[in-house]
Amino acid sequence: MSKINKLEQIRNIGICAHIDAGKTTTTERILYYTGKSHKIGEVHEGGATMDWMEQEQERGITITSAATTCRWQDKVINIIDTPGHVDFTIEVERSLRVLDGAVAVFDGVAGVEPQSETVWRQADKYNVPRMCFVNKMDRMGADFYRCVEMIKDRLGARSLIIQLPIGIEENFKGIVNLIKMKAVIWKDESLGAEYFEEDIPADMQDKAAEYRARLLDMVVELDDTIMEQYLSGAEITEEQIKILIRKGTIEARFYPILCGSAFKNKGVQPLLDAIVDFLPSPIDIGIVKGIEVSTSEEKDFPISIVEPFSALAFKIMNDPFVGSLTFIRIYSGKITSGATVINTVKNKREKIGRMLLMHANNREDIKEASAGDIVALAGLKDTSTGDTLSDIDKQVVLERMEFPEPVIELAVEPKSTADQEKMGLALSRLAAEDPSFRVSTDHETGQTVIKGMGELHLEIIIDRMRREFKVEANIGAPQVAYRETITTACEIDYTHKKQSGGAGQFARVKIIFEPLKDVIDLKDEDKNKTFVFESKIVGGAVPKEYIPGVEKGLNNIRETGVIAGYPMIDFKATLVDGAFHDVDSSVLAFEIAAKGAFREGMQKGNPKLLEPIMKVEVITPDEYMGDIIGDLNSRRGQIQNMDPRGNAQVVTAHVPLAEMFGYVNTLRSLSQGRAQFSMIFSHYDQVPSQVADMIKAKK
């Protein structure tokens, strides 16, 4: 491995898209043509290599991002296959954080769907260079040009078309390569492994010339010398075009667009060529942001093999044979099995046991890995998703990932005493794997409550609990995960004092509580958080060692709000003053004082109840439009826009999650089964007062 595993030879890429756009099939074909799979796995037969959990094979959707290493030309491609269902958006977010480039797969019939937009925005957030693969060109109703138009309109993406389809629907047989100006035709009888180049068909020559001119107009903008050459009428070489496309893709000036049919094995090899030619290597990315532990300074760290070791844990998975596996992306230095590193987030040392290179769910033991590699480590004790592993002598904390608040929750009760213990273990394992899944205990009923990003998310968690951990449980009805917040700022001066013989307890804190939306000088790293704590103590009014007690107290108690006991979010607490006693003060005393201040502050801050609002997209034939809009309005929905799409209408609305239970049946009866919908969490918003009263009464 080591000789070719130089940084410039590596491509760390994700394949992401909406559910059913053909992402897993595309990945399967890539593995087949790069020689890693000996037979092609079909998703609809439940045999796809990347979909390795039982639940995935049954449902035909990808739930966890399996990481796979393969080779093309002389390059190493690490592929992360990401889920396309909206309940698993967190998986996509985790993968994008550690990737250098991505391939966005679009359904040539449906075009840009809601999850495609979400994934695109997430990729924008992490500045991931990407290209687009318009798939399913063999399907009835496929329209490459309409799909490209949607990519431009809906995603605001500057498209660079580098291929055109030859033939449509069942007559789709190949592509025009606009860089070489050649047609590429696949032989059906060889399962797409054999293809040949020929001249562009006569009826497509004018169109190809037009799109080639557009391609050149866009790429020559990136280089003045080549632009002059182009304007003077000189020929631009294929090599020059490729260099410019690579430059523009890495700088996100445009997004190359390719097409094909992964299922029919057409277009996969040129897609692999484009991944290698146009997507960045770790060297092109160059740096990773982080904090130097010794100075607490934020710095840019070079991605390099010669620097000290640093890596980000981006996924934890339970493997039936190896136990817990931690997937890491190495940003700098190298690591050998048996070495000891430090988890700088938890300040705990970890010994590296087995190190594995993963191929979906086959594994290869390796002894060494270095910058740019994505590997799985077995046997780490304290590392969870988003933690940094670092060289002990030169410690860094890499930029952490932010995870969304869960929107739906349900109670689970073990069926027997034996299940009780197993359930605790199962849920803590599953929560370690997936930060968007949370477990808590209802203080009033003592029930265990699980929370997640949607009904399917929790269904799969419960299913895994039964299958992998053999836990039988009774499941309650899904409930909305309400939240609470404050709407006005207040300052609380609170003293905790206890004297009952022997050492007493004393702590005084002065805390300003304010809604996050009103904070003017909010730091960038705090912008996605739901709770921010800051200490502005000067002159030792509260000694440094007691301040973590204040933060811990606030963090613990904010899980129980003051209106109906829901967690408090979207506020900042600033410790501005306080007092301590040489003998009677302790971390615990300051923790209790912070809790007392919180209770007072939340009452004074004009608290309000919040509910999750979902972005709902309904695709319906024209004739049912009126009924569907009327129904959404009756669910407290707000229509955002209406777009024609082919012979159907697309209605986008913001609707409270509380009003969406059972919507699938209503929609079916309103449209005689012809409309479909998808929904994704959008934001939290205040609950109208009459609805809030009903929620409080239920509590």
Swiss-Prot record:
CDD domains: EF-G (cd01886), EFG_III (cd16262), EFG_mtEFG1_IV (cd01434), EFG_mtEFG_C (cd03713), EFG_mtEFG_II (cd04088)
Molecular function via GO: GTP binding; GTPase activity; translation elongation factor activity
Record PROSITE patterns: G_TR_1, G_TR_2
Subcellular location: Cytoplasm
Pfam families attached to this UniProt entry: EF-G_D2, EFG_C, EFG_III, EFG_IV, GTP_EFTU
Source organism, top-level taxon: Bacteria
Record Gene3D superfamilies: 3.30.230.10, 3.30.70.240, Elongation Factor G (Translational Gtpase), domain 3 (3.30.70.870), P-loop containing nucleotide triphosphate hydrolases (3.40.50.300), Translation factors (2.40.30.10)
Binding site for GTP: 17-24, 81-85, 135-138
GO biological process: ribosome disassembly
Entry keyword set: Cytoplasm, Elongation factor, GTP-binding, Nucleotide-binding, Protein biosynthesis
InterPro entries listed in its UniProt record: EF-G-like_DII (IPR053905), EFG_II (IPR041095), EFG_III (IPR009022), EFG_III/V (IPR035647), EFG_IV (IPR047872), EFG_V (IPR035649), EFG_V-like (IPR000640), G_TR_CS (IPR031157)
tr-type G domain mapped to chain residues: 8-283
GO cellular component, one term: cytoplasm
Family annotation (SUPFAM superfamilies): EF-G C-terminal domain-like, P-loop containing nucleoside triphosphate hydrolases, Ribosomal protein S5 domain 2-like, Translation proteins
Protein role: Catalyzes the GTP-dependent ribosomal translocation step during translation elongation. During this step, the ribosome changes from the pre-translocational (PRE) to the post-translocational (POST) state as the newly formed A-site-bound peptidyl-tRNA and P-site-bound deacylated tRNA move to the P and E sites, respectively. Catalyzes the coordinated movement of the two tRNA molecules, the mRNA and conformational changes in the ribosome.
Family recorded in the similarity comment: Belongs to the TRAFAC class translation factor GTPase superfamily. Classic translation factor GTPase family. EF-G/EF-2 subfamily.
Name of the protein described by the UniProt record: Elongation factor G
Origin species: Rickettsia prowazekii (strain Madrid E)
Encoding gene per record: fusA
